[in-house]
């Protein structure tokens, strides 16, 4: 086990062999972290969580429910599969243009309604 600085590990927590935990991470009571895991900085793991062997949590992830399988979980509350996080962020980057398109479509619908009412 490799532990960085400023880590809080509460009562009855279990940390599997070859697991690395970076600084400013908190592990609440009775959490169970598997073998060969990587926990990046500022991760918070709620109590009684089970983390599967080989799991990776990127920085600032908050683990609020047990993992269903090993994988890479990324930033956010709660932590989620990395692939889902990337998809969500791709959509977030498109929000300004999507919002502009919606406003344009709303104006077109309003004009069509107005034209239909005039007839």
What is the role of each PLM region?
Residues 1-81:
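Structural signal for interior beta-strand "rungs" in well-ordered beta-sheet cores
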Residues 80-119:
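Long, leucine- and charge-enriched amphipathic alpha-helices
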């Amino acid at each position: 086990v490799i532990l960085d600085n400023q880590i809080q590990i509460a009562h009855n927590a279990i940390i599997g062999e070859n697991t690395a935990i970076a600084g400013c991470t908190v592990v609440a009571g009775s959490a169970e972290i598997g073998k060969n895991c990587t926990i990046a900085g500022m991760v918070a793991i709620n109590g009684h969580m089970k983390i599967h062997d080989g799991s990776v949590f990127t920085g600032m992830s908050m683990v609020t429910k047990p993992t269903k399988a090993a994988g890479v979980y990324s930033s956010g509350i709660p932590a989620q599969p990395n692939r889902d996080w990337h998809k969500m962020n791709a959509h977030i980057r498109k929000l300004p243009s999507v919002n502009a398109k919606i406003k344009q479509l709303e104006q077109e619908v309003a004009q069509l309604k107005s034209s239909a009412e005039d007839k």
